[in-house]
Amino acid sequence: MKKMSNIYESAANTLGIFNSPCLTKVELRVACKGISDRDALSKPDPCVILKMQSHGQWFEVDRTEVIRTCINPVYSKLFTVDFYFEEVQRLRFEVHDISSNHNGLKEADFLGGMECTLGQIVSQRKLSKSLLKHGNTAGKSSITVIAEELSGNDDYVELAFNARKLDDKDFFSKSDPFLEIFRMNDDATQQLVHRTEVVMNNLSPAWKSFKVSVNSLCSGDPDRRLKCIVWDWDSNGKHDFIGEFTSTFKEMRGAMEGKQVQWECINPKYKAKKKNYKNSGTVILNLCKIHKMHSFLDYIMGGCQIQFTVAIDFTASNGDPRNSCSLHYIHPYQPNEYLKALVAVGEICQDYDSDKMFPAFGFGARIPPEYTVSHDFAINFNEDNPECAGIQGVVEAYQSCLPKLQLYGPTNIAPIIQKVAKSASEETNTKEASQYFILLILTDGVITDMADTREAIVHASHLPMSVIIVGVGNADFSDMQMLDGDDGILRSPKGEPVLRDIVQFVPFRNFKHASPAALAKSVLAEVPNQVVDYYNGKGIKPKCSSEMYESSRTLAP
């Protein structure tokens, strides 16, 4: 057991923090309860210091205000941190007694601490733990941390315009009008936001409704000026100017109340020259509807669980596990590539699964007692309950099953994709964002059931499910790249395309000289968008109710 633990820790300890485009920012609110002071005759002046681990070292991120003589402090200062789903972000909250005459830290001032990951906080939304001091509980003191997404504006707005009595610019027919909307930038430049279709031969056109992100429309500022221009289309590209007007998103939102918002379309030249000029027509906004675009953290904080499943290749091409050249060879202290990949990805996913029970399967081996070939057997040999307790449990089940198997073949992965897809399909019956499935497949060779696998992936693309494939060893994986839709659209043998890209494939050798965290970062970076794409595409909102949200904001530990 000691060797297993060493292998697990060896793989896990290399996980670090990387700089990459931030998915989102999270605000952390902190409160403590029952803080005990070293001096029983007085109350402490507590301050909470947030530290983050990078490359094995802890560094201070920020600290709260000091609350004088208080054993149950609720801090107003918020911690703002960048959130990366694909990384293990280790945090330490330290409570110190800061006396009024100094702001430094002494060992005697330390009242207790708590370590966790940012993933644990956001998945539970409200995390309460006992404070520890030198490995022991610090009396009855505890700390509570609440996470809240500091979101940008990713909402979309749907707009529909029509016009009345536009100027006629054509001699032998009526104008062919279209509308352009420009955002006025801070540097006095203007950015085209949308161009409508052309409505032919019509002075009172009704343009089709369109959607545009609020960020694109006004950079999130409802008071930003918008310039709208109406043109008469000409086939030679020299469109005739009809008129223009300016507005703001704030003004346009008046149409959300069922009212029409309208503007006079003005031609400045006509207005300057013609004494009785009124306008060149009227433009009416008859629809303004905001579509909420929920984020990954909206779903996670709303209670969506990540159901992590692992499938391991036990085909003969891996080599005899008793031989040190085998990809399945168990070194006493150095994890093999299968274990490195498993721990790197599993360490992250486990924070988003409340029960920490992970189904683990094998494929391509003859299994006891009859030693028939199976492509979806439980590596704990309990087909009724293939779940293992934590990533450590998966590691132990993997090492325990190796001597009992006969490595064989072929390398078929469609059965395991279909097995997980069946569970994901049952989840769709709830019509809720309750569970999203991630299947990690670890394989040493090119799969032999490509047609069936393509069919299974196309089917799975309609389900709350993502597939991560890591190729271990030195095989030629060029044919595997076709499963990853980055270079084109994957299709079933019958020609049906995937509904969305759900597969990520990487060869482990690309990360051989990097830490396993780099592998996890590569294969998991797309998962948040895949989760959002699925639920937004289905019109499924986060499960969290307003009552649950309000209760999570309560800081009483």
Curated annotation (Swiss-Prot):
SUPFAM superfamilies: C2 domain (Calcium/lipid-binding domain, CaLB) (SSF49562), vWA-like (SSF53300). Ca(2+) 2 binds at D170, D232, D234, D240. Widely expressed. Expressed strongly in the brain, heart and prostate. Expressed strongly in peripheral blood leukocytes. Residues 305-507 form the VWFA domain. GO terms for molecular function: calcium-dependent phospholipid binding; metal ion binding. Its cofactor is Ca(2+). Residues 3-131, 137-264 form the C2 domain. GO terms for biological process: cellular response to calcium ion. InterPro entries: C2_dom, C2_domain_sf, C2B_Copine, Copine, Copine_C, VWF_A, vWFA_dom_sf. Ca(2+) 1 binds at D170, D176, D232, D234. One of its GO terms (cellular component) is plasma membrane. PROSITE patterns: C2. Keywords: Calcium, Metal-binding, Repeat. Probable calcium-dependent phospholipid-binding protein that may play a role in calcium-mediated intracellular processes. Interacts (via VWFA domain) with ACTB, BCOR, BICD2, CCDC22, CDC42BPB, CEP162, MYCBP2, NONO, PDCD6, PITPNM2, RDX, SKIL, SKT, SPTBN1, UBE2O and WTAP. Belongs to the copine family. This is Copine-4. It comes from Homo sapiens. The lineage of its organism: Eukaryota, Metazoa, Chordata, Craniata, Vertebrata.
